[in-house]
From Swiss-Prot:
InterPro entries: Restrct_endonuc-II-like, tRNA_endonuc-like_dom_sf, UPF0102_YraN-like
Coiled-coil ranges per UniProt: none
SUPFAM superfamilies in UniProt: Restriction endonuclease-like
Classification via Pfam families: UPF0102 (PF02021)
Protein name: UPF0102 protein Sare_1228
GO MF: nucleic acid binding
Protein family: Belongs to the UPF0102 family.
Amino acid sequence: MSRRNQAVGAYGERCALQHLITAGMRPVERNWRCPHGEIDIIAWDGPVLAICEVKTRRTDTFGAPAAAVTGPKARRLRVLAAQWLAETGTRADEVRFDVLSVRVTAAGPPRIEHLKGAF
């Protein structure tokens, strides 16, 4: 991944995090990594633990950002969430998997779409 794409992705994650905070969610972890992958943001939405995948795009050339979350990616996030819960000892009666699509353009602020329970 190019440095520019990394910078755009990092910017998108910061925007998504601020969006979640503004919406009243409480982030508990950001960019949690293990040998099997990474979870972008983990946050409480009231009593629900939200595992959030952030996808950022500058254009729609390759489709909507959320379209990049494929079946294998969703399965991997489920495994990662179970691992995070086990490692941290966190208890959650409900775990939800969200996708935040961030569209960054040169004109205007980024557009953020938060798909709760995306998969």
